[in-house]
Regions:
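DNA breakage-rejoining catalytic core of tyrosine-based enzymes
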Residues: 2, 44, 95-97, 108-130, ...
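Short, charged phosphate-coordinating catalytic segments
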Residues: 87-99, 142-173, 296
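Catalytic-site neighborhood detector that most strongly recognizes the C-terminal catalytic loop/helix
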Residues: 111-112, 173, 202, 302-328
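Conserved catalytic core of the tyrosine transesterase superfamily
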Residues: 130-138
Length: 350
């Protein structure tokens, strides 16, 4: 009689030894969620009904890692890992029962929050363009060239072709432990690409190169070394704080008030929502869509492994902007019905 905890530990050890660190961490996180609930249970006693109750339990509690409700993505990951653990145990004849996680994804609560990809707004974009900071150049490249965080970290000045206005995206970084990256040839999907640099950020790049003092990397630590996970996180957080302060300071001056100092003990009100590196990349894709760039070209510029990924984004944007267009139409024709009275009982206009 073998417990779920023992089976899950065996499975995790055998499947994760040659996986990327980040994927290992994701599997471990999902496994820990499952062990917290099923850990001491004998695997043969866990039924589909128990999994249903577990899903219901999660829907009624918050994720201890985030303090927020479990998202559809987390539900899906947990159920998928549970299914894989039981499949592994059955395949190796460690247990003799049906897989209780089979087809349980259909049980994911419909009201579970779904993490939406959202582009940055015009205020955030304006701040990126006008507020100088060492992190600004990274934000500009991700926003206007669509590079991933893992592609901007190892990006070198040698990858920038100022004459042809192109960036050669030929490498990426992989996390090898909780803090350190290694540079790997090729990008996330194994495909190199060349991205055009829009005219509006050429001056920023030239100025940054002039001030780089011969540094190899376009966006590095202050010491010139490639970023670690912690140095990136710290720099990005400081950058977000600076953008918020600049907006707050400008607003106070417009109101003829004296802004608090940057490091005021009472803190600065959050007026500009922090954004992620991935949001900048998503904004780039949104701008490609709004500019009328065709699907195939957009997919190449984004470096997607499959055009279907780009299609999903374009389809979502299509639905969003079509809704906006019908709202404009409704507002336009509102004047046509201002004086109209509809008699519901007689089903006629009077």
């Amino acid at each position: 009689m073998i417990t779920f905890e023992k089976i899950s530990n065996i499975w995790l050890e055998n499947v994760s030894f040659d996986l990327q660190y980040t994927y290992q961490a994701e599997l471990k996180n999902a496994t820990n969620h499952l062990k917290a609930y099923f850990g001491e249970r004998v695997c043969d006693t866990i039924k589909g009904l128990d999994v249903d109750e577990y899903i219901r339990y999660l829907s009624q509690h918050k994720n201890p890692n985030t303090g927020k409700p479990y998202s559809k993505r987390i539900f899906s990951d947990i159920i998928d890992v549970g299914c894989r653990i039981f499949d592994y145990a059955l395949e190796n004849e460690l247990i003799d029962c049906r897989n209780p996680f089979y087809k349980k994804k259909r049980k994911i609560p419909k009201n579970a929050p779904k993490k939406e990809r959202t582009p940055i707004d015009d205020i955030q974009k304006d701040l990126i363009l006008k507020v100088y900071n060492r992190t600004q150049i990274a934000a500009l490249i991700m926003l206007y060239c669509g590079l991933r965080r893992g592609e901007i970290i190892p990006l070198e000045w040698a990858d920038i072709d100022f004459i042809n206005k192109q960036i050669a995206v030929t490498k990426s970084v992989e996390l090898i432990n909780s803090n350190n990256y290694i540079v790997k040839p090729h990008t996330k999907n194994g495909k190199d690409r060349y991205v055009s640099i829009p005219d509006n950020i050429i001056p920023y790049l030239k100025l940054e190169k002039y001030n780089s003092n011969g540094c190899q990397y376009i966006y590095s630590q202050k010491c010139g070394k490639i970023h670690t996970a912690s140095s990136w996180k710290s720099s990005w957080k400081s950058y977000q704080t600076l953008l918020n302060y600049r907006y707050y300071s400008d607003l106070m001056k417009q109101q003829e008030k004296t802004p608090k100092p940057y490091n005021a003990p009472t803190g600065i009100p959050v007026l500009v929502e922090p954004f992620t590196a991935h949001q900048l990349r998503h904004t780039y894709c949104t701008m490609l869509y709004l500019a009328g760039v065709d699907l195939k070209t957009a997919s190449k510029l984004m470096g997607h492994s499959d055009v279907k990924i780009t299609l999903d984004i374009y389809t979502h944007l299509d639905e969003k902007y079509k809704r906006l267009n019908i709202d404009k139409f409704n507002n336009y024709i509102a004047k046509d019905t201002t004086n109209q009275i509809f008699d519901i009982q007689n089903q006629k206009v009077v």
